[in-house]
Amino acid sequence: MPTNSQDTTVLHALFGGTFDPIHYGHLRPVEALAAEAGLNRVTLLPNHVPPHRPQPEANAQQRLKMVELAIAGNPLFAVDDRELHRTTPSYTIETLEAIRKERGAALPLAFIIGQDSLLTLHKWHRWQSLLDTCHLLVLARPGYNDRMDTPELQQWLEQHQVTDAALLSRQPQGYIYLADTPQLEISATEIRQRRHQGLNCDDLLPRSVQRYIELQGLYR
């Protein structure tokens, strides 16, 4: 997209995940984050081959379809399927650099992660380049420590952390914002296990996604 078509006062956010399946533990905290940080659009990025996790049970097209069903009619969300076309592992920094190049150097850009991911961020591929490309918006997660593993990592966090979300739209990248979002005890692993056991998942994910899972015979 041409750089001159972008509003450089609006923060654009991206949220990656395997989404195997997508559920309310993904959607509800991001909706709360959007209200807290003034986001008007969050683009979901389904992973193809996550480098640090087991292979998904659902295939790429099934996971994309579940994301599309989950966000249908919700103007906050969009989906970008670029990672599903990769044949190599999906490294976050490579995707972010490609999006930054497309959208221009001046656009405020943020990547949403969970608190659990923040604590292991130093194990990610080229993790120290992330803040050269975007801001990090961190969702609260139940049961996780709020401090980094080492004094050096904690210092890195404190050097980049801001508590005023308004600052995120004033520069293109470089900040970390720890959001006060709902901590939902929902995981895709739990949903898959419940499906394997024939248990009800009504309160865990949108009904449209449930219907698709049932029609496709997923997670049996």
Curated annotation (Swiss-Prot):
- State what protein this is by name: Probable nicotinate-nucleotide adenylyltransferase
Family annotation (InterPro entries)? Cyt_trans-like, NadD/NMNAT, Rossmann-like_a/b/a_fold
Keywords from the UniProt entry = ATP-binding, NAD, Nucleotide-binding, Nucleotidyltransferase, Pyridine nucleotide biosynthesis, Transferase
What the entry lists under Gene3D superfamilies is as follows:
HUPs
Role this protein plays: Catalyzes the reversible adenylation of nicotinate mononucleotide (NaMN) to nicotinic acid adenine dinucleotide (NaAD).
What Gene Ontology terms for biological process does this UniProt record contain?
NAD biosynthetic process
Catalysed reaction(s) here are: nicotinate beta-D-ribonucleotide + ATP + H(+) = deamido-NAD(+) + diphosphate
Q: Name one Pfam family in it.
A: CTP_transf_like
Superkingdom, taxonomy of origin = Bacteria
The entry sums up its family as follows:
Belongs to the NadD family.
Picking any one GO molecular function of the record gives: ATP binding
What organism is recorded for this protein?
A: Serratia proteamaculans (strain 568)
Q: What class of enzyme is it?
A: transferase
The pathway where this protein functions is: Cofactor biosynthesis; NAD(+) biosynthesis; deamido-NAD(+) from nicotinate D-ribonucleotide: step 1/1
* EC number, as in UniProt: 2.7.7.18
